[in-house]
Amino acid sequence: MERYENLFAQLNDRREGAFVPFVTLGDPGIEQSLKIIDTLIDAGADALELGVPFSDPLADGPTIQNANLRAFAAGVTPAQCFEMLALIREKHPTIPIGLLMYANLVFNNGIDAFYARCEQVGVDSVLVADVPVEESAPFRQAALRHNIAPIFICPPNADDDLLRQVASYGRGYTYLLSRSGVTGAENRGALPLHHLIEKLKEYHAAPALQGFGISSPEQVSAAVRAGAAGAISGSAIVKIIEKNLASPEQMLAELRSFVSAMKAASRA
Protein backbone atom coordinates (compact mmCIF):
# COMPACT_ATOMS: atom_id res chain seq x y z
CA MET A 1 0.00 0.00 0.00
CA GLU A 2 2.87 2.37 0.84
CA ARG A 3 4.05 2.22 -2.77
CA TYR A 4 0.90 4.09 -3.86
CA GLU A 5 1.39 6.74 -1.17
CA ASN A 6 5.02 7.21 -2.21
CA LEU A 7 4.10 7.39 -5.89
CA PHE A 8 1.35 9.98 -5.46
CA ALA A 9 3.57 12.08 -3.16
CA GLN A 10 6.37 12.08 -5.77
CA LEU A 11 3.98 12.89 -8.63
CA ASN A 12 2.45 15.68 -6.57
CA ASP A 13 5.88 17.21 -6.01
CA ARG A 14 6.53 17.05 -9.76
CA ARG A 15 3.02 18.35 -10.54
CA GLU A 16 2.16 15.44 -12.79
CA GLY A 17 -0.50 12.76 -12.95
CA ALA A 18 -0.05 8.99 -12.97
CA PHE A 19 -0.32 6.97 -16.15
CA VAL A 20 -1.31 3.36 -15.39
CA PRO A 21 -1.55 0.76 -18.17
CA PHE A 22 -3.65 -2.41 -17.85
CA VAL A 23 -2.79 -5.76 -19.42
CA THR A 24 -3.85 -9.35 -18.80
CA LEU A 25 -1.09 -11.51 -17.30
CA GLY A 26 0.03 -14.22 -19.73
CA ASP A 27 -1.33 -12.53 -22.88
CA PRO A 28 -0.27 -13.69 -25.47
CA GLY A 29 2.04 -16.09 -23.57
CA ILE A 30 4.09 -15.90 -20.38
CA GLU A 31 7.45 -14.94 -21.93
CA GLN A 32 6.06 -12.19 -24.19
CA SER A 33 3.78 -10.97 -21.38
CA LEU A 34 6.81 -10.38 -19.13
CA LYS A 35 8.53 -8.48 -21.97
CA ILE A 36 5.38 -6.39 -22.46
CA ILE A 37 5.29 -5.47 -18.76
CA ASP A 38 9.01 -4.52 -18.76
CA THR A 39 8.35 -2.35 -21.83
CA LEU A 40 5.38 -0.59 -20.19
CA ILE A 41 7.53 0.27 -17.17
CA ASP A 42 10.56 1.34 -19.23
CA ALA A 43 8.30 3.60 -21.34
CA GLY A 44 7.13 5.50 -18.25
CA ALA A 45 4.22 3.65 -16.61
CA ASP A 46 3.84 4.91 -13.02
CA ALA A 47 1.98 1.83 -11.77
CA LEU A 48 0.57 -1.39 -13.24
CA GLU A 49 -2.97 -2.73 -13.30
CA LEU A 50 -2.91 -6.44 -14.18
CA GLY A 51 -5.67 -8.93 -14.89
CA VAL A 52 -5.60 -12.64 -14.10
CA PRO A 53 -7.21 -14.64 -16.95
CA PHE A 54 -10.85 -15.38 -16.16
CA SER A 55 -13.44 -17.20 -18.26
CA ASP A 56 -16.31 -14.74 -17.81
CA PRO A 57 -15.03 -11.17 -17.36
CA LEU A 58 -18.33 -9.29 -16.96
CA ALA A 59 -16.99 -5.74 -16.86
CA ASP A 60 -14.81 -6.16 -19.90
CA GLY A 61 -15.52 -5.49 -23.55
CA PRO A 62 -14.43 -7.74 -26.43
CA THR A 63 -10.81 -6.50 -26.54
CA ILE A 64 -10.01 -7.60 -22.98
CA GLN A 65 -12.17 -10.74 -23.28
CA ASN A 66 -9.94 -11.73 -26.22
CA ALA A 67 -6.84 -11.09 -24.09
CA ASN A 68 -8.25 -13.54 -21.53
CA LEU A 69 -8.86 -16.11 -24.28
CA ARG A 70 -5.30 -15.75 -25.61
CA ALA A 71 -3.87 -16.28 -22.12
CA PHE A 72 -6.09 -19.37 -21.67
CA ALA A 73 -4.98 -20.67 -25.07
CA ALA A 74 -1.37 -20.32 -23.87
CA GLY A 75 -2.31 -22.48 -20.85
CA VAL A 76 -1.79 -19.70 -18.29
CA THR A 77 -3.08 -20.54 -14.79
CA PRO A 78 -3.61 -18.32 -11.71
CA ALA A 79 -0.65 -20.10 -10.05
CA GLN A 80 1.59 -19.10 -12.97
CA CYS A 81 0.26 -15.53 -12.74
CA PHE A 82 1.47 -15.35 -9.14
CA GLU A 83 4.89 -16.65 -10.25
CA MET A 84 4.96 -13.89 -12.89
CA LEU A 85 4.01 -11.29 -10.26
CA ALA A 86 6.90 -12.41 -8.05
CA LEU A 87 9.31 -11.98 -11.00
CA ILE A 88 7.91 -8.54 -11.85
CA ARG A 89 8.20 -7.41 -8.23
CA GLU A 90 11.78 -8.69 -7.94
CA LYS A 91 12.80 -6.77 -11.07
CA HIS A 92 10.80 -3.60 -10.25
CA PRO A 93 10.85 -3.15 -6.45
CA THR A 94 9.11 0.25 -6.21
CA ILE A 95 6.32 0.31 -8.81
CA PRO A 96 2.79 -0.15 -7.42
CA ILE A 97 1.18 -3.34 -8.75
CA GLY A 98 -2.61 -3.68 -8.74
CA LEU A 99 -4.70 -6.70 -9.67
CA LEU A 100 -8.10 -6.51 -11.31
CA MET A 101 -9.93 -9.68 -10.30
CA TYR A 102 -13.30 -11.39 -10.31
CA ALA A 103 -14.70 -12.85 -7.09
CA ASN A 104 -14.59 -16.50 -8.24
CA LEU A 105 -10.81 -16.38 -8.54
CA VAL A 106 -10.52 -14.82 -5.08
CA PHE A 107 -12.85 -17.44 -3.54
CA ASN A 108 -11.07 -20.33 -5.21
CA ASN A 109 -8.63 -21.21 -2.41
CA GLY A 110 -10.29 -19.07 0.24
CA ILE A 111 -10.34 -15.28 0.48
CA ASP A 112 -7.64 -15.01 3.14
CA ALA A 113 -5.28 -17.37 1.30
CA PHE A 114 -5.68 -15.28 -1.86
CA TYR A 115 -4.68 -12.03 -0.15
CA ALA A 116 -1.85 -13.78 1.72
CA ARG A 117 -0.45 -14.93 -1.64
CA CYS A 118 -0.80 -11.38 -3.00
CA GLU A 119 1.20 -10.06 -0.05
CA GLN A 120 3.84 -12.76 -0.54
CA VAL A 121 4.54 -11.82 -4.18
CA GLY A 122 4.47 -8.06 -3.61
CA VAL A 123 1.04 -7.03 -4.93
CA ASP A 124 -0.11 -3.62 -3.61
CA SER A 125 -3.82 -3.51 -4.43
CA VAL A 126 -6.76 -5.64 -5.53
CA LEU A 127 -9.95 -4.50 -7.25
CA VAL A 128 -12.65 -7.20 -7.29
CA ALA A 129 -14.74 -6.04 -10.24
CA ASP A 130 -17.94 -7.94 -9.49
CA VAL A 131 -18.18 -7.26 -5.74
CA PRO A 132 -20.14 -4.08 -4.88
CA VAL A 133 -19.10 -1.95 -1.91
CA GLU A 134 -21.97 -3.19 0.26
CA GLU A 135 -20.82 -6.84 -0.13
CA SER A 136 -17.11 -6.10 0.19
CA ALA A 137 -16.52 -6.59 3.94
CA PRO A 138 -14.84 -10.05 3.82
CA PHE A 139 -12.65 -8.95 0.90
CA ARG A 140 -11.52 -5.63 2.30
CA GLN A 141 -10.93 -7.08 5.78
CA ALA A 142 -8.70 -9.84 4.36
CA ALA A 143 -6.95 -7.28 2.14
CA LEU A 144 -6.11 -4.99 5.06
CA ARG A 145 -4.92 -7.94 7.17
CA HIS A 146 -2.31 -8.56 4.47
CA ASN A 147 -1.40 -4.91 3.79
CA ILE A 148 -3.18 -4.96 0.41
CA ALA A 149 -5.15 -1.87 -0.62
CA PRO A 150 -8.80 -2.68 -1.40
CA ILE A 151 -9.76 -0.67 -4.51
CA PHE A 152 -13.32 0.46 -5.16
CA ILE A 153 -15.01 1.71 -8.30
CA CYS A 154 -16.72 5.09 -8.19
CA PRO A 155 -19.30 5.21 -11.03
CA PRO A 156 -20.25 8.51 -12.71
CA ASN A 157 -23.73 8.38 -11.18
CA ALA A 158 -22.54 7.71 -7.59
CA ASP A 159 -24.78 9.20 -4.91
CA ASP A 160 -23.48 10.76 -1.73
CA ASP A 161 -23.76 7.54 0.32
CA LEU A 162 -21.70 5.58 -2.19
CA LEU A 163 -19.07 8.34 -2.40
CA ARG A 164 -18.74 8.26 1.39
CA GLN A 165 -18.43 4.45 1.42
CA VAL A 166 -15.83 4.40 -1.35
CA ALA A 167 -13.86 7.10 0.48
CA SER A 168 -14.11 5.28 3.79
CA TYR A 169 -13.30 1.72 2.64
CA GLY A 170 -10.89 2.29 -0.25
CA ARG A 171 -7.11 2.53 0.04
CA GLY A 172 -4.32 3.06 -2.49
CA TYR A 173 -6.38 4.76 -5.18
CA THR A 174 -10.02 5.17 -6.21
CA TYR A 175 -11.04 3.80 -9.63
CA LEU A 176 -13.12 6.57 -11.14
CA LEU A 177 -15.31 5.36 -14.01
CA SER A 178 -15.51 7.68 -16.97
CA ARG A 179 -18.91 6.15 -17.76
CA SER A 180 -21.07 3.09 -17.14
CA GLY A 181 -20.91 -0.05 -19.28
CA VAL A 182 -18.04 -2.31 -20.31
CA THR A 183 -14.42 -1.37 -20.95
CA GLY A 184 -13.25 -0.37 -24.39
CA ALA A 185 -11.37 2.27 -26.28
CA GLU A 186 -14.33 2.63 -28.68
CA ASN A 187 -16.46 4.03 -25.88
CA ARG A 188 -14.38 7.11 -25.20
CA GLY A 189 -14.51 8.41 -21.65
CA ALA A 190 -16.80 11.40 -21.21
CA LEU A 191 -15.34 14.19 -19.10
CA PRO A 192 -15.57 16.27 -16.99
CA LEU A 193 -16.05 14.57 -13.64
CA HIS A 194 -15.06 17.58 -11.53
CA HIS A 195 -17.95 17.21 -9.10
CA LEU A 196 -17.17 13.57 -8.24
CA ILE A 197 -13.47 14.29 -7.86
CA GLU A 198 -14.18 17.27 -5.59
CA LYS A 199 -16.54 15.19 -3.42
CA LEU A 200 -14.05 12.32 -3.16
CA LYS A 201 -11.38 14.78 -2.03
CA GLU A 202 -13.80 16.32 0.47
CA TYR A 203 -14.41 12.84 1.96
CA HIS A 204 -10.64 12.10 2.02
CA ALA A 205 -10.83 9.25 -0.50
CA ALA A 206 -7.67 7.70 -1.93
CA PRO A 207 -6.52 9.59 -5.07
CA ALA A 208 -8.81 9.10 -8.07
CA LEU A 209 -7.50 7.45 -11.24
CA GLN A 210 -9.87 7.71 -14.16
CA GLY A 211 -10.44 4.59 -16.26
CA PHE A 212 -12.74 3.14 -18.96
CA GLY A 213 -12.30 4.37 -22.51
CA ILE A 214 -9.00 6.21 -21.99
CA SER A 215 -7.25 5.83 -25.34
CA SER A 216 -5.58 9.15 -26.22
CA PRO A 217 -3.06 11.54 -24.63
CA GLU A 218 -5.73 14.30 -24.71
CA GLN A 219 -7.93 12.22 -22.40
CA VAL A 220 -5.05 11.77 -19.95
CA SER A 221 -4.36 15.50 -19.76
CA ALA A 222 -8.12 16.21 -19.49
CA ALA A 223 -8.42 13.78 -16.55
CA VAL A 224 -5.51 15.47 -14.77
CA ARG A 225 -6.94 18.93 -15.47
CA ALA A 226 -10.29 17.78 -14.01
CA GLY A 227 -8.47 17.03 -10.74
CA ALA A 228 -7.89 13.28 -11.09
CA ALA A 229 -4.54 11.93 -9.87
CA GLY A 230 -4.08 10.19 -13.22
CA ALA A 231 -5.59 7.78 -15.72
CA ILE A 232 -5.75 4.05 -16.43
CA SER A 233 -5.76 2.71 -20.00
CA GLY A 234 -6.52 -0.93 -20.80
CA SER A 235 -8.30 -1.66 -24.06
CA ALA A 236 -6.12 0.73 -26.10
CA ILE A 237 -2.99 -1.06 -24.83
CA VAL A 238 -4.44 -4.54 -25.37
CA LYS A 239 -5.44 -3.57 -28.94
CA ILE A 240 -1.75 -2.92 -29.71
CA ILE A 241 -0.95 -6.43 -28.44
CA GLU A 242 -3.77 -7.95 -30.51
CA LYS A 243 -2.75 -6.09 -33.68
CA ASN A 244 0.88 -7.26 -33.50
CA LEU A 245 0.60 -10.90 -32.44
CA ALA A 246 2.60 -11.98 -35.50
CA SER A 247 5.41 -9.48 -34.85
CA PRO A 248 6.45 -9.41 -31.17
CA GLU A 249 9.20 -6.80 -31.65
CA GLN A 250 6.85 -4.42 -33.47
CA MET A 251 4.36 -4.96 -30.62
CA LEU A 252 6.90 -3.82 -28.03
CA ALA A 253 7.94 -0.81 -30.14
CA GLU A 254 4.33 0.35 -30.55
CA LEU A 255 3.59 -0.17 -26.85
CA ARG A 256 6.67 1.87 -25.97
CA SER A 257 5.64 4.85 -28.12
CA PHE A 258 1.99 4.73 -26.97
CA VAL A 259 2.90 4.64 -23.26
CA SER A 260 5.52 7.39 -23.70
CA ALA A 261 2.92 9.66 -25.31
CA MET A 262 0.29 8.87 -22.65
CA LYS A 263 2.80 9.51 -19.84
CA ALA A 264 3.93 12.78 -21.44
CA ALA A 265 0.29 13.94 -21.39
CA SER A 266 0.14 13.38 -17.62
CA ARG A 267 2.67 16.19 -17.24
CA ALA A 268 0.47 18.71 -19.06
UniProtKB/Swiss-Prot annotation:
- Catalytic activity as recorded in UniProt: (1S,2R)-1-C-(indol-3-yl)glycerol 3-phosphate + L-serine = D-glyceraldehyde 3-phosphate + L-tryptophan + H2O
Query: In which family does this protein belong, per the annotation?
Result: Belongs to the TrpA family.
Q: Could you describe the subunit structure of this protein?
A: Tetramer of two alpha and two beta chains.
- Function (record text): The alpha subunit is responsible for the aldol cleavage of indoleglycerol phosphate to indole and glyceraldehyde 3-phosphate.
Q: Does the keyword Amino-acid biosynthesis apply?
A: yes
Q: What cellular component GO annotations does this protein have?
A: cytosol
- Which HAMAP family would you find in this protein's record? Trp_synth_alpha
Q: Which GO terms describe its molecular function?
A: tryptophan synthase activity
Instruction: Tell me the superkingdom of the source.
Output: Bacteria
Please identify the protein, giving its name as recorded: Tryptophan synthase alpha chain
Supply the SUPFAM superfamilies for this chain. Answer: Ribulose-phoshate binding barrel
Pfam families, sorted = Trp_syntA (PF00290)
Q: Which InterPro entries match?
A: Aldolase_TIM, RibuloseP-bd_barrel, Trp_synthase_alpha_AS, Trp_synthase_suA
Query: Which organism encodes this protein?
Result: Salmonella paratyphi B (strain ATCC BAA-1250 / SPB7)
Enzyme Commission number(s) of this protein: 4.2.1.20
Q: Does the keyword section mention Ribonucleoprotein? A: no
**Which pathway features in its UniProt record?**
Amino-acid biosynthesis; L-tryptophan biosynthesis; L-tryptophan from chorismate: step 5/5
> Catalytic site residues?
49, 60
Q: Kindly state which keywords UniProt assigns to this record, in alphabetical order.
A: Amino-acid biosynthesis, Aromatic amino acid biosynthesis, Lyase, Tryptophan biosynthesis
